Amino acid sequence: MTRSPAPSSPTHPRRLGLTGSIGAGKSTVARLLRERGLTVLDADAEARWVTEQPEVLTELNEAFPGVVTGGTLDRAGLAARVFSDPAQVARLNAITHPRVRARMEALEAAATARGEHWVVQDIPLLFEGGLERGMDAVLVVDAPLELRLERALARGGLTREDILARDARQLSSEEKRRRATIVLDNSGPLEALEGQLDAALRQLEIT
């Protein structure tokens, strides 16, 4: 499924959103985009950077006592505490999201200064956060559920039940596909994915 990209603002490069369900292969596509010379802003990496800053650690420990020990955030403990409680998630997001946005905007400004015409924003919960409205186009990486589960389990750290629970809290793959500008089907070999990606970049006039 494809649709035309929205017009971009003259104050920043065009924004290509990148998202996908757990195990779909979004990280692989992000790597391929970097190999093709595009700047990829990784929302998860920037969120990790933000939560390493002393003032943020202080706020997090005040909001969630005990999650910071010796200046280090217990990420697993924090995730377990907020995961099933929407009010706690909202509290965490209120601390981190404005800072992550500011960080992404600063990196985007640097890309603008380098004369780049497009930047990629790699955001796992792009649709769930309503962030597609700020994108000029959105790539959704998708694959069948069982294949996604197999890949996610191979990474380790999560059980099948954990993965299914996280997946259930996101928009369905079908809804993500419906909202996408272009869908990349990652159910085949890497070469097939690369071919689809290159075709998408040509369609969007990125390369």
UniProtKB/Swiss-Prot annotation:
SUPFAM superfamilies: P-loop containing nucleoside triphosphate hydrolases. It is an enzyme of class 2 (transferase). It is found in: Cytoplasm. Pathway: Cofactor biosynthesis; coenzyme A biosynthesis; CoA from (R)-pantothenate: step 5/5. Its main location: cytoplasm. Transmembrane segments: none annotated. Its EC number is 2.7.1.24. Residues 1-21 are annotated as: Disordered. It catalyses: 3'-dephospho-CoA + ATP = ADP + CoA + H(+). Residues 1-11 have a biased composition (Polar residues). Keywords: ATP-binding, Coenzyme A biosynthesis, Cytoplasm, Kinase, Nucleotide-binding, Transferase. GO terms for biological process: coenzyme A biosynthetic process. GO terms for cellular component: cytoplasm. The keyword Nuclease does not apply. One of its GO terms (molecular function) is dephospho-CoA kinase activity. PROSITE patterns: DPCK. InterPro entries: Depp_CoAkinase, P-loop_NTPase. ATP binds at G23, A24, G25, K26, S27, T28. Residues 15-207 form the DPCK domain. Belongs to the CoaE family. Catalyzes the phosphorylation of the 3'-hydroxyl group of dephosphocoenzyme A to form coenzyme A. This is Dephospho-CoA kinase. The gene is coaE.
